[in-house]
């Protein structure tokens, strides 16, 4: 077999179900020969997004793979890979490479060198014989510790070279690290000594598939639970201890309970400071738990650290809290649930005029409300897009099942939600996969709805169309006044129709729910659907600032 066949066989043994790709790359044909389905995207960043979304929903137990052409193909993939790196998504990128003899001839693009700052691990194949070792290292990097994209650049001459002998390769297992027992004892002591403890869960809880354990610890302490943007749905948000997730916008109770907390356990989060992450205000006792020791004290001063896999940390904490606390505490738990419920009710009352609005153009919060009431939230995977949809969805979309929301925002590329939604649908075909994007975002990647139609990936794409990039109005006043700089017009339902995607444009409140039902019905038949809502130019976001960040 040649090098391409070797890599394809390894992918087969690792459980690869499809290859997101854009030609030319010899791996595409080699994978097709082994019944690994090639899915050709319109744009490389969307193909990367498909691998990303698949990896998220598979929680790193299986990994999405993207193959690109040498030179312009892998150059054009940069936005997607940078986004995945910011979000710690464990996926595999395999670009073809130009001849090794020309590697340092300008302007040859050396992918394995250029991508090193935005990958967890990056390597170049020099010989066909080293391919099994490189692939083993790549899968180990994806399945141990903190996730991240890995890249193996394979020059075409290595793909074409003959591999002699039998292939000796066994699939790589997930590696997890258990916490230090002494660190667990001190963390439990701090939580139980706190007057107002709070748990802040990141996406590490989702990757560890530890949501039930998170809820168990919260009820045992007891403590309310907030989540980061990527950690949204780590606790079902209809749980009486859930405070919701945070980007720049957040539920008011998130801010209120974080302000009064004296001890915060951040688990499964890097606590990286971004404009779209909550952070932990200064002046609190911070217990920081991550599977990557480099996260500790990176951005926040940790008063106590627990390094380990989130599921193993939670198991150990539950056992230790039970040991230190003993029986009882039901009254405290009931009182805390009542306090959270009252705070949530008051916050939603503040926003009722938006949520229940009958205005036209439509209010985005009314559309979100009707989406939540109409779809099966236990059977959905939903994501926002960059910009206003993120700020509107993160606070107000109430999740009911772990892993039912894909939050992202350390890098915030317009249009990224489309690709990851296709990947999510491929990972969980029984779920309704839905992305909410604005008119600016669809301008970036919208042509790839044709990819969904061509490949029978039945996603639901919701477009909020107000004809303007509303979130940028405050930074471009002169440009807007003199040149109308923010206007972005279009009828996206008609665009979808031209790309063989069923679609509907909704302008009246009474048509929202019937439109949603029609869209869901079409996806259930096996085809994608684009549902466009003509919405108002909105600047109302649920922003309750946290001081001391």
List each language-model region with its residue ranges.
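Conserved donor sugar-nucleotide recognition element shared by glycan-biosynthetic enzymes
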Residues: 47, 74, 107, 364, ...
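Glycine-rich phosphate-binding loop signature in dinucleotide/nucleotide-binding domains
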Residues: 59-60, 145, 376-377, 428-430, ...
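Thiamine diphosphate
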Residues: 102-104, 297-299, 305-307, 311-315, ...
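Active-site diphosphate/adenylate-binding microenvironment
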Residues: 4-7, 12-14, 18-34, 342-424
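Phosphate/pyrophosphate-binding active-site segments
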Residues: 2, 129, 165-167, 189, ...
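Conserved short loop/turn motifs at secondary-structure junctions
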Residues: 202-206, 356-357, 438-440
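N-terminal alpha/beta PP-like core and its mobile active-site loop of ThDP/TPP-dependent enzymes
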Residues: 1-331, 432, 451, 458-461, ...
């Amino acid at each position: 077999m040649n090098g391409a066949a070797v890599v394809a066989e390894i992918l087969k043994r690792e459980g690869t179900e499809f290859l997101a790709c854009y030609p030319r790359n010899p791996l595409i044909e080699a994978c097709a020969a082994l019944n690994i389905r090639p899915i050709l995207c319109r744009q490389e960043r969307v193909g990367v997004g498909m691998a990303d979304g698949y990896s998220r929903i598979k929680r790193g137990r299986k990994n999405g793979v993207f193959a690109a052409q040498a030179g312009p193909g892998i150059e054009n993939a940069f936005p997607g890979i940078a986004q995945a790196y910011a979000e710690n998504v464990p996926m595999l990128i395999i670009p073809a490479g130009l001849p090794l003899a020309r590697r340092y001839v300008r302007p040859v693009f050396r992918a394995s060198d250029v991508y090193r700052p935005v990958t967890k691990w990056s390597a170049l194949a020099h010989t066909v014989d080293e391919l099994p070792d490189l692939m083993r290292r790549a899968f180990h990097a994806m399945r141990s510790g903190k996730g991240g994209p890995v890249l193996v650049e394979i020059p075409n001459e290595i793909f074409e070279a003959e591999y002699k002998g039998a292939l000796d390769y066994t699939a790589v297992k997930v590696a997890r690290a258990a916490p230090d027992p002494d660190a667990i004892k001190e963390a439990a002591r701090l939580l139980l000594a706190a007057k107002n403890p709070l748990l802040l869960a990141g996406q590490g809880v989702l990757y560890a598939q530890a949501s039930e354990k998170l809820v168990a610890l919260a009820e045992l302490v007891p403590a309310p639970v907030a989540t980061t943007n990527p950690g949204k749905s780590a606790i079902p948000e209809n749980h009486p201890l859930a405070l919701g997730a945070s980007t720049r916008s957040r539920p008011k109770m998130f801010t209120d309970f974080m302000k009064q907390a004296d001890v915060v356990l951040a688990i499964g989060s890097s606590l990286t400071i971004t404009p779209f992450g909550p952070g932990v205000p200064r002046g609190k006792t911070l217990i920081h738990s991550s599977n990557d020791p480099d996260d500790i004290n990176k951005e926040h001063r940790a008063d106590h650290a627990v390094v380990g896999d989130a599921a193993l940390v939670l198991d150990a904490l539950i056992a230790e809290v039970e040991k230190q606390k003993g029986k009882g505490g039901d009254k405290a738990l009931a009182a805390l649930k009542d306090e959270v419920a009252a705070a949530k009710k008051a916050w939603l009352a503040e926003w009722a005029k938006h949520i229940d609005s009958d205005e036209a153009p439509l209010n985005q919060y009314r559309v979100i409300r009707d989406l939540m009431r109409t779809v099966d939230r236990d059977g959905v995977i939903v994501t926002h897009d960059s910009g206003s949809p993120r700020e509107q969805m993160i606070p107000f979309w109430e999740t009911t099942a772990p892993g039912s929301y894909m939050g992202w925002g350390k890098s915030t590329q317009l249009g990224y939600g489309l690709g990851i939604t296709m990947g999510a649908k491929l990972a969980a075909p029984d779920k309704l996969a839905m992305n909410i994007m604005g008119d600016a975002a669809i301008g970036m990647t919208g042509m790839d709805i044709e990819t969904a139609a061509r490949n029978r990936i039945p996603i639901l794409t919701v477009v909020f169309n107000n004809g303007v990039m509303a979130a940028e109005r405050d930074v471009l006043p002169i440009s807007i006044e003199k040149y109308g700089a923010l206007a972005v017009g279009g009828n996206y339902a008609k665009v979808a129709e031209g790309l063989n995607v069923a679609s509907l444009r909704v302008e009246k409140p009474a048509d929202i729910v019937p439109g949603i039902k029609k869209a869901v019905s079409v996806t259930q038949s096996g085809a994608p659907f684009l549902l466009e809502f003509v919405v108002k130019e909105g600047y109302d976001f649920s922003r309750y600032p946290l001081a001391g960040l």
